[in-house]
UniProtKB/Swiss-Prot annotation:
GO cellular component: large ribosomal subunit
HAMAP family assigned to the protein according to its UniProt record, in alphabetical order: Ribosomal_bL32
Name used for this protein in its record: Large ribosomal subunit protein bL32B
GO annotation (BP), single: translation
MF terms (GO), sorted A to Z: structural constituent of ribosome
Superkingdom as given in the UniProt entry: Bacteria
Length: 57
């Protein structure tokens, strides 16, 4: 099996890993109550989605 000829430097390794990170969830403000909620999800505070009540709060 092939083995790297030279050791990978810290800079090269870190440049390669710049995209390996955690992403923050997409949060939007609820149009009804103003609380933050996940995009495309029912608001946990007021139970509304797309201007309609879909869950009991």
């Amino acid at each position: 099996m092939a083995v790297p000829f030279r050791r990978t430097s810290k800079a090269k390794k870190r440049k390669r890993r710049t995209h390996v990170k955690l992403q923050l969830p997409g949060m939007n403000e609820c149009s009804n109550c103003g609380e933050y909620r996940l995009s495309h999800h029912v608001c946990p505070e007021c139970g509304q989605y797309d201007g309609k009540e879909v869950a009991n709060s």
